[in-house]
Amino acid sequence: MIPFWKKTGKHSKPQSAQKRRQNAKPAVPRTAQQSIPMQRMFEDGTCRVKPNYYTRTIQYQDINYQLAQQEDKTAIFEEWCSFLNFFDSSIKFELSFVNMATDSTEFEKSIRIPFQKDGFDDVRAEYSQMLRQQLAKGNNGLTKTKFITFGVEGESMAQVKPRLDHIQNDLLNNFHRLGVQAKPLNGVQRLKLMHDMFNMDGASKFHFDWKDLVKSGLSVKDAIAPTAFAFKNSRTFQMGGIYCAASFLSITASDISDQLLKDFLDMDSSQIVTMHIQSVDQNRAIKTVKRTITELDRSKIEEQKKAIRAGYDIDIIPSDLATYGRDAKALLKELQSQNERMFLVTFLVLNTGRTEQELENNVFQASSIAQKHNCNLCRLDYQQEQGLMSSLPLADCQIEIQRGLTTSSTAIFIPFTTQELYQSGKESLYYGLNALSNNLIMVDRKRLKNPNGLILGTPGSGKSFSAKREITNAFLVTDDDIIICDPEAEYAPLVERLHGQVIHIGPASTQYINPMDINSNYSEEDNPLALKADFILSLCELVVGGKEGLQPVEKTVIDRCVHVVYRKYFENPTPENMPLLEDLYNALLTQDEPEARHVAAALEIYVKGSLNIFNHHTNVDIHNRIVCFDIKQLGKQLKKLGMLIVQDAVWGRVTANRSAGKSTRYYADEFHLLLKEEQTAAYSVEIWKRFRKWGGIPTALTQNVKDLLASPEVSNIFENSDFVYMLNQANGDRQILAKQLNISPHQLSYVTHSGEGEGLLFFGNVILPFVDHFPKDLELYRILTTKLNEISEGAQK
């Protein structure tokens, strides 16, 4: 093992006059601007740090390394090793991890729901209060960002630009292979980053425009420099109103854990962790190791000679010598045959505090983390300014303390921990707190490729509450229409509070929906009747029943009659001409096939009998923004039929809204009831697929995962749902879901005997554990809850 590499100067070649001028020590800076070690920033993000040295910076996002399965962790680690091996000895690079306190006022403003003077501002105020309470539980006041900065030498910008472009594109592709989102920073973004690092006290806001440089005669440094640097003592310094201390990590552990970097980044204070990494030319590294082995062998021979002269066994040599010899030979083998390279690493930590005591506490915490991993955090005595400037994302290390590490040893500082889900935007909704970081989860399902969603969980796990919370949030911040299919009469209090419309469908109700309703937008094809016929076939399958469902001849006669009964309406599309189930019944009776009379006989009870509630023209105006279909009174015989008819009514609303450019959110509780009959399941799956194209955002709630995966066709609902809100799961369902969604055992623990409002969120390719403990002292909670004791308590108040 080669622990440290030192820069040699003893046998170096004589330097030219130009080189001597470039390497001459700069004059002591007289201003804060002069302290900043950069010369020029270009608009494309290229920075000339010093003569003939240019750098660029890429910002990258986190991925879920800590939650991944072991084989996935291994794959990420190996891919990161390949990422590091990409850099040859001509490229210097730096990994920067910047944790900075966000202005709490600004952050609260970003989550506050603006008033709209529509009669619901009191609800908005209470929902914003809930968000502030949840924010206080986490550390969202700390913004964590990650960057990689790389630099190459060249005589001019024109010479280095093609190479920088090439390296940048390769790095972006390498990040893409890791599943990491990354973007290069332009000049303004790099300047803002450095401004924020220099002005952690928040006293100065960043204002910069390229056009102002020429007029004002100022430089870019004037836009980023703090009010002052004060390097008054050897161990700390002041930067604006912040106290700081720069330290380096002495890596003395024989075995480094992949948790070391994570533990540093989990600290709840503003800090900058920096890793400067320089690849060593492979031939030079191998020669150096061989030279070290030769020197160790020479020392071993000397020790053996001493042993002979002293008259003791020549195999007894100092243990350190034997250990170093084994390590050096193992290192040589790795470099020669195991795709390992040698890197020189400088690991820096810049701690901050608003007072000297707070700074010392933060440094002590960082030192404890280092000691926990058998390393030492050493203060950069008399090098605080160099430590600060080396922490800037400029890939310019001014600290000459380097540790030699192989690719694998360097890659163990894995820069990925926990992915966050926080999307800023008007329509981002709240889904709880990240269980790993306690940060708010705020996302907009419309940004997904497929916004369809599932809410899964055992009874009492919080399915209905989660759906109601999302409905409330969507109602308050979006213009979307919201329709609910409510088989258990749970949503009426919320809908009424939001001045919505509750439609009670049951034998004793006088509110009717005509399942034969159709509009010209019903299908994107020229013939909307084809999709309507598919729905009516599904309806007849539920009516006729039987294990085999509808027979081919029965399907044929039903389809024939559908075209007959709609003929009059399409000739003159008025509400009076809209057909009823009775028209279909009569048309079936006119057919010659006995199968037609069989279907008509099955339909009779729904036309002339006691279950004729669906044989009426629609008499409710379902154009309210939030509509709830309460089908609890339908009973078992009619509930599936009612759910199917509601689904069709929703489809009609979705198609009408599409032409108006409006989204429609649909919530279907007890969704598994629609998946037991083949034709009905097939129709539901087809509608599920169509929703996305037409601006629909359906959400299915169910406790029966087995029904969702009962057939390959039904399992398409999973494949067409990029949003899954998974609460506590029964044992059998857990195993099914683990296989279907590739959930690791560690991830599965978050839905095993979990409490209410706790589970896993699947958002696109991101999997996050969440916790949503909604404050119970709010009026909104009493409206959302389905617990009888809490509902009765709320009524008494």
Where are these regions (language model features)?
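Extended, folded cores of ATP/NTP-driven motor/assembly subunits in large transport
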Residues: 2-418
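Post-Walker A helix-loop "phosphate-sensing" segment adjacent to the P-loop in P-loop NTPases
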Residues: 473-483
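Conserved lysine of the Walker
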Residues: 463
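Conserved P-loop NTPase
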Residues: 741-796
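Hydrophobic positions on the alpha1 helix immediately C-terminal to the Walker A/P-loop
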Residues: 466
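Hydrophobic anchor at the beta1->P-loop junction of P-loop NTPases
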Residues: 455
